[in-house]
Curated annotation (Swiss-Prot):
Name of the protein: Tyrosine--tRNA ligase
BP GO terms, sorted: tyrosyl-tRNA aminoacylation
Taxonomic placement: Bacteria, Pseudomonadati, Pseudomonadota, Betaproteobacteria, Neisseriales
GO molecular function: ATP binding; RNA binding; tyrosine-tRNA ligase activity
Organism (species): Neisseria meningitidis serogroup A / serotype 4A (strain DSM 15465 / Z2491)
Gene this protein is translated from: tyrS
Motif 'KMSKS' region: chain residues: 231-235
Family stated for the protein in its record: Belongs to the class-I aminoacyl-tRNA synthetase family. TyrS type 1 subfamily.
PROSITE patterns: AA_TRNA_LIGASE_I, S4
Matching Pfam families: SYY_C-terminal, tRNA-synt_1b
Compartments (UniProt record): Cytoplasm
Reaction it catalyzes: tRNA(Tyr) + L-tyrosine + ATP = L-tyrosyl-tRNA(Tyr) + AMP + diphosphate + H(+)
Length: 431
């Protein structure tokens, strides 16, 4: 199966230019292709995964991937289908983000062998180009009429109170020149990107043909949608980042576990390197079992291992199991740090707090009266163990102090997992 056929079978092709010619070229020879990543934050998020993994799929098929980080274009920001003008970031901020994203992209690709990946930065050429060169050598090849007819531009112009600045209007010229430059430097003949990049990609194809007299191609990947119509890649806490310091491996693992049955088999095709035959077998087995599908677990394991590694996957599984177990002794200090980052609602507490106060503080009870009822009915657990009276000498005017949180409840001297009922948790972080 060719790489194009594999992408088609996974539903990963939204649009292409001359797919027959591209498929024939890929079958005849090994090519160089690229995808651009603008630094709009200090980390990539799961919305970037399809193009990143597509580069990897092409490399596994023997082709040379080029990961282009937009040190120059990131200073402006892509206006495509954005409702309003982007805020401009300082050169120092963008430079820091460029380095972070370069480091994140590196593990996905191999930089050794005959088709070793290439890391590029468009600041290397735009940083040396002056305004007159830009207008003479690039600008003259672009029709303003054609640019105004782009859907992404028309939406901005037609939106009341929005409009588009010349800075953002000129973005497609910069991205278009990236293709021509990478074609000249590295022989790149294919640009891939998200479906919102189609206009920019075709602009680059046309410019490369004009400047270099070369036939090149474009391929876009689909917009990832969920069956319920909500946006993919967002949680109540915001974006799901690939940086473990912004989204913990535990929370990352949980995100994939919660994928709906209606989406999970599509996402296995989109995001994993399991074969179509393996995915079809998983789906058939799930449908025949009549029990909870295994697909979500497989997806969560594959994705967490791919992004964070085997050790992080094991930690995510250990945390997931321990939260609902009586014995939480297997949790490490690093596990608690993940929970404090984004795994559980975290609350700072001080010595002397009792269980009733902790339940109300964390929102696990709406009142002291309700909290006492939970404690009396043995519905409250501390680190997996039932909360019990441990302070017989408490003051008569403070009856709730009969059940105090003490040093013995502090894991690593800092953390206590408070649980009410089967599924309601909070993390107490001791000052």
């Amino acid at each position: 199966m060719s790489v194009i056929q594999d992408l088609q079978s996974r539903g990963l092709i939204a649009q292409t230019t001359d797919i027959e010619a591209l498929d024939a070229l890929l079958n005849e020879q090994k090519i160089a292709l690229y995808c651009g990543f603008d630094p709009t934050a200090d980390s990539l998020h799961i919305g970037h995964l399809l193009p990143v993994l597509a580069l990897r799929r092409f490399q596994q098929a023997g082709h040379t991937p080029i990961a282009l980080v937009g040190g120059a274009t990131g200073m402006i920001g892509d206006p495509s289908f954005k409702a309003a003008e982007r805020s401009l970031n300082s050169a120092e901020t963008v430079a820091g983000w460029v380095e972070s994203i370069r480091n994140q992209l590196t593990p996905f690709l191999s930089f050794e062998g005959g088709n070793a990946a290439i890391m590029a930065n468009n600041a290397d050429w735009f940083g040396k180009m002056n305004c007159l060169d830009f207008l003479r050598d690039i600008g003259k090849h672009f029709s303003v009429n054609a640019m105004l007819n782009k859907e992404s531009v028309k939406q901005r112009i037609d939106r009341d109170g929005a409009g588009i600045s010349f800075t953002e209007f000129a973005y497609s010229l910069l991205q278009g020149y990236d293709f021509a430059e990478l074609n000249k430097r590295h022989g790149a003949v294919l640009e891939i990107g998200g479906s919102d990049q189609w206009g920019n990609i075709t602009a680059g194809i046309d410019l490369t043909r004009r400047l270099n007299q070369k036939q090149v191609f474009g391929l876009t990947l689909p917009l990832v949608t969920k069956s319920d119509g909500t946006k993919f890649g967002k949680t109540e806490g915001g974006a799901v980042w690939l940086n473990a310091k912004k989204t913990s491996p535990y929370q990352f693992y949980q995100f994939w576990l919660k994928v709906a049955d209606a989406d999970v088999y599509k996402f296995l095709k989109y995001f994993t390197f399991l074969s179509i035959e393996e995915i079809d077998a998983i789906e058939a087995k799930d449908k025949a079992s009549g029990t909870k599908p295994e697909a979500q677990r497989i997806l969560a394991e594959e994705m967490t291992r791919l992004i964070h590694g085997e050790a992080a996957l094991q930690a995510a599984q250990r945390i997931s199991e321990s939260l609902f177990a009586e014995d939480q002794s297997s949790l490490t200090e690093s596990d608690f740090e993940q929970l404090a980052l984004d795994g559980l609602p975290a609350f700072e507490v001080s010595d002397g707090i009792n269980v009733v106060e902790a339940l109300v503080k964390t929102g696990l009870a709406s009142s002291n009266k309700e909290a006492r009822g939970f404690v009396n009915s043995k519905a409250v657990l501390l680190n997996g163990k039932p909360a019990e009276a441990n302070n017989p000498n408490h003051a008569a005017e403070r009856p709730d102090d009969a059940c105090l949180l003490t040093d013995e409840h502090k894991r690593f001297g800092k953390y206590t997992i408070l649980r009410r009922g089967k599924r309601n948790h909070a993390l107490l972080v001791w000052k």
